[in-house]
Every structure is written in C-alpha cells, then in structure tokens.
C-alpha cells in the first residue's frame, strides 16, 4: 500500500511522528531507522515480540529514554519540549501506585500534580467499578488497581495516552471491562491511544491503527482496515516439490511447503494463478506472518510513513 497522503497535511494531524528514530544501548540497537506517523484520535496497537523495541519506543515518547538518532514529535512539537508534558499520560504494566494511599488520596494526588485535572472523569471511572474510595490501594484486587490507574491517566485529560501491557495481569472479565472503558473514554474525548499488547485478539477488537515492530524496526504501520486486505493467503499444489516460481512475481511475507502442498502469505502485485486457492487472512494471521518473517518487506498504508528528512515516502 503506497503512501499517497497530501504534502500539505499539518503536523497537528499526527499524534506521534518519528523520523529516523533510533536508540542504541551497549548491547546494540533497540530501535533503528524508525519513521512512522500515528494520526490523532486513533487507537493504535503497538505489536511485537519480547525485545522488539516496543517499551523503548514508549520510553522515547515519555522522555524516559533519550534517542541516539532521529526525531520524535508529539502533535508536531518535539518530544523534549516541556509543552508536551501536559498532553501525555503513560500507564505501564506495573502500574506504580502508592500502596499506602487510599483511593481518595490517590485521586487527590492526581489533582495536585495535574493542572487540568478532571475530577468528575476520574471519580466516574472508579465508581463504575465499585472501588471503595476509603480503601488502601495495597488492599485492592488487580482489576481494581488497574481501574484506579486508568482513573489517574484519564483524569489528566491527556491528548495522547500511552499504555504498556496495561491489562496483562487481569482475568478475562476484568480485561473486557477495562477494554470497554478504554474505548468509551477515548471516543468521548478524542484521545489518541497507543497500546502495547501481546494479545492479538484484544488488539483486533480495539484498535483501528497498527504499528508492528520486530528486531528494532518498523514492519507494518497504518490503518488496520487497509493492512489486512493488502494480503492474500494462497494455497496450491507444488509441481516438483518446491515453491512455485510464480510466487516471485509477488511480495511474499511467509511461505511454507508441506509435501506437495504450499501455502504463502503474499501481497499480490498482479493476477494470481487461477488454480491457487485464495482467502483473505485474519488480522492475527497477518501479524503472525510478519512477526515470524522480520526480513519481509515492510508495509505502510497511506500517510503512515515519512522519510528521515520529513518528506513523504512511497
């Protein structure tokens, strides 16, 4: 899918915009040559295996990590500009809350630290889960603590909410409740959400935008509704026990040969042979194919990429 977005799009249209972004540690590059854009008002799934660079990317967006190369902007403003701080909220997997504080004290702390605090929204989120305001945070269940953490995040009224595996420790019922809460609050406020998660089905239900990272590089970026139809799952019979030469005319993400039958995830660059069976893959199948094949050519949908100099990239 080529990038055909208009050159006069304003930077404010992009919640996050990276150009040539990279981070190197002693052991090597955690992220390298990352250029992408996430539109404002979207719920973006950040996908990748352990060690892919997801947490590093979120760390760069929250100024917890300093980049080695490149540039990262939040709503068109450099991420290290103090003006960005009130616009961004971050919720990590460990949800660092003061266990000796009561829920009420925790929300009061949020009000004192954030000038634009929305007490009504924070209290609404807590009350919806029947969380006792007088209970100490350390006595709450995992689902209740997560709800309090979400209340702190949304009470800040951020324009950009960054979530690092926020629901990994929840049971299925609590996870469903938090997912519903997240989507409702994001839609109501127009908040841009970037959420890292290993749960592909969860992302499929919630996210309308995707950023796929593998081995420190961007593998896919763009609208979920455009990324999936760009792929076709083909199955056919091998004539000589090897992959058919016709595959070379298409972008092959992943292929496998079992006996005399082959199967491949491709991005067609023209008509496919009539004797091949064709099916549209699920989002999960597309993501897994790209994660298993980090050397496959990357894919960006319209507007999702700029090059390191900030110009449109095809």
Over which residues does each language-model region extend?
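Catalytic Walker B motif of ABC-type/P-loop ATPase nucleotide-binding domains
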Residues: 161-165, 170
């Amino acid at each position: 899918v080529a990038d055909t977005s208009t050159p006069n799009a304003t930077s404010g249209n992009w919640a996050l915009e990276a150009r040539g972004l990279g981070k190197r540690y002693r052991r090597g590059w955690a992220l390298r040559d990352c250029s992408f854009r996430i539109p404002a008002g979207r719920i973006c799934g950040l996908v990748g295996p352990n060690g892919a660079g997801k947490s590093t990317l979120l760390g760069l967006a929250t100024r917890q990590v300093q980049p080695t190369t490149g540039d990262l902007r939040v709503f068109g403003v450099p991420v290290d500009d103090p003006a960005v701080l009130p616009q961004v909220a971050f919720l990590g997997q460990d949800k660092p809350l003061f266990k000796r504080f009561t829920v009420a004290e925790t929300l009061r702390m949020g009000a004192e630290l954030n000038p634009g605090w929305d007490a009504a929204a924070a209290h609404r989120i807590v009350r919806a889960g029947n969380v006792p305001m007088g209970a100490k945070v350390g006595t709450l269940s995992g689902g209740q603590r997560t709800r309090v953490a979400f209340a702190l995040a949304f009470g800040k009224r951020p324009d950009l909410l960054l979530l690092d595996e926020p629901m990994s420790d929840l049971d299925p019922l609590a996870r469903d409740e938090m997912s519903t809460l997240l989507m409702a609050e994001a839609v109501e406020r127009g908040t841009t959400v970037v959420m890292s998660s290993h749960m592909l089905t969860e992302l499929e239900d919630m996210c309308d935008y995707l950023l796929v990272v593998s081995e420190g590089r961007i593998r896919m970026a763009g609208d979920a509704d455009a990324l999936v139809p760009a792929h076709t799952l083909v199955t056919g019979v091998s004539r000589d026990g090897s992959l058919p030469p016709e595959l070379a005319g298409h972008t092959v993400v992943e292929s496998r040969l079992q006996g005399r039958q082959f199967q491949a995830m491709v991005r067609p660059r023209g008509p496919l042979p009539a004797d091949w069976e064709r099916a549209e893959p699920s989002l999960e199948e597309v993501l897994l194919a790209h994660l298993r094949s980090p050397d496959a050519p990357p894919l960006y949908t319209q507007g999702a990429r700029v090059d390191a100099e900030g110009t449109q990239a095809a």
